[in-house]
Amino acid sequence: MDLTFLAFFVPFAAALVAPPIMRALGHNGAWALALAPAFLFLHWCGFLPEIATGGRVTGGYQWIPSFNVNFSWFIDGLSLTFALLITGIGTLIVLYAGGYMKGHPMQGRFMSFILMFMGAMQGLVLSDSFFMFFVFWELTSITSFLLIGFKHDAEKSRRSATQALVVTGAGGLILLAGLIVIWNVTGVSEFSLLLASGDILRDSPFYIAAFVLVLGGAFTKSAQFPLHFWLPNAMEAPTPVSAYLHSATMVKAGVYLLMRLNPAMGHTDAWETVLPLFGGTTLLVGTILAVRQTDLKLMLAYTTVASLGLLVMLTGFGTHKAIEGAVLYLIAHSLFKGALFMVAGNVDHEAGTRDVTKLGGLLSLMPVTFGAAIFSAISMGGLPPMTGFLAKEELYYGVAVSAEPWALLVTAVAIAGNALMFVVGFVVALKPFLGPKVETPKHAHEAPVLMLAGPVILAVASLVSAVLSPLYHEFFSSPMASAVIGEAV
């Protein structure tokens, strides 16, 4: 049996054994459970050479032949990069959760939910058939509901989880209608075949209907204005969930969908007007709300809303350089945002608060956490020598030199939004650690190894990917941009 087929089920198998493993080994069970996503990461790495040379991999099995429903997968630069982010960062999140949830009576259940969430997101980005894609899309909503509402005895957690489920679940039904329209217009129900049917779809009188329905699904999942409200409220979830949700998983599912469909649905007036309009608005709204917060997680959550808006804006802008900037920024954001959320979790876990007005002077007590924070903030701010610098240089260039009528406005919005994100990033990285020591609810000390591995490795990855930019471009950003554009770059 194909190993890739089995890879779809590995996270769910790990989820089944997570409770007994955590009961038997305690928090150290995280090391054993992390082997599952680590194996998947290595498996997907095996596709890098072929994908880097412009190859695409498809495969699968017939499921319901009478309805042309297959269990099929499609691996190209876009899906492979997402799969590597999901499993690579997922490995670190499992380790982090082991330390963060140490001693919690339900840590086994929590690990099980995290692994199911990972499996749902991995399946979503690798699915070729529309049916498989929709099943995994809705499964991400269900598993995120379980994670956001993990503290089910708290009214606020239950309300936030329900809100996220209603918004994203309803968006999924809207998306299903859009996929059915696309299927009826083009006669294909697999993404790998749809990419060659773009002219048929764009010329159809049903294009606008499909476009609006697809956007309904994508905008709910990726928290675009005015549907952004559920994402900050999801911060009621434990920090490992927040870090994973914002760096590599569900909130980028909508962006993934738009990037996947760009070759087939892009290059129209509707696409190149609506996406920059809503994306740019979301970018500005997110950053303005971020600078008004004092809670570390809320500050980072609103900058995620802003970053998702930036990615949608660039995806809709339509030029090759803008797309290249978008894919560079997507990867960079996954690295620095995952690290910063784990930093916020370390501070909250060890000091007892994440209110920046009640924090200060932690540098001598948490030097490793501070190191990860400052490197990640430098990347978030778009400063050298981090990969965030490469991403922001590329995206500014991609919109500023364009002859598109929106170019000047989009450039101004991108600069304004990123300037505010720069401020937020350094407030998160500096305020808790510098200045005079502030009395905190708990006697602060450095986080345990399980909680340091994630932020340190992601911060180092932000540096290494910039230093080794030729390899980074060859194996990651270039194949991904080619998949989004629909031709080699």
Predicted regions: what they are:
Residues 2-10, 39-42, 49, 405-408, ...:
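Membrane-embedded helix-loop-helix hairpins and adjacent transmembrane boundary segments
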Residues 57-67, 190-198, 394-398, 471-489:
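Membrane-interfacial helical/loop segments at transmembrane boundaries in membrane proteins
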Residues 1-5, 15-112, 184-202, 229, ...:
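Transmembrane helix-loop-helix hairpins at membrane boundaries of multipass inner-membrane proteins
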Residues 7-8, 15-16, 33, 222, ...:
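Hydrophobic alpha-helical transmembrane segments of integral membrane proteins
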Residues 34-48, 168-179, 373-381, 454-471:
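Hydrophobic alpha-helical membrane-insertion segments
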Residues 92-133, 142-447, 467:
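Hydrophobic transmembrane alpha-helices and their helix-loop junctions in integral membrane proteins
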Residues 445-489:
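Hard-cation-handling environments
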Residues 138:
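Short phosphate-coordinating micro-motif centered on Lys-Gly-acidic
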